[in-house]
Amino acid sequence: MYMYHMNIGYPLLTENSEFYINSYEVVPRDEEAKKGLAQWNQMIPPTPNFAEQCFYHHYHTDLAKMMVYNKDIEKGIQICFDTKEFPQNLQWKMMGERDYVLGLEPCTADLDGRHTIKKNSEILTLEPAESKDFSVNVHLFNDKSQWESAK
């Protein structure tokens, strides 16, 4: 499995940040994430004893877009990737009092363990001396109009 794990934190990430992903379906990874499914895209204030929530995103498009924008500082970020290269995408939401972060993770398989990945025939393998190129594009925004036009 190959994965990019990009953490977004303060000052870009606050309870006033907007979050957008162009997925058609959001699937909770576990029981804890099911509790937060209705608020998967809402940032909240740092919360004592917050339990992490992870969500898988599925796409109907070849280009995935994950975006965070903070209107208070007029800054934002967009992470784009080809959904054929990265057929899975995990959103890690941790709104804890000391651990306040949003992890955005394009990956080649889900994170439910090698045994499950092999069973579902999702594992990417390379032969000896074989290579594969992957790309993820990151764009930074300086105002709301850039954010809106990037959606």
What residues fall within each predicted segment?
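HotDog/MaoC-like acyl-thioester-processing domains
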Residues: M1-N16, Q146-K151
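Sparse, context-dependent recognition of short Cys/His-centered cofactor- or disulfide-binding micro-motifs
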Residues: Y4, A51-Q53, A64, P87-N89, ...
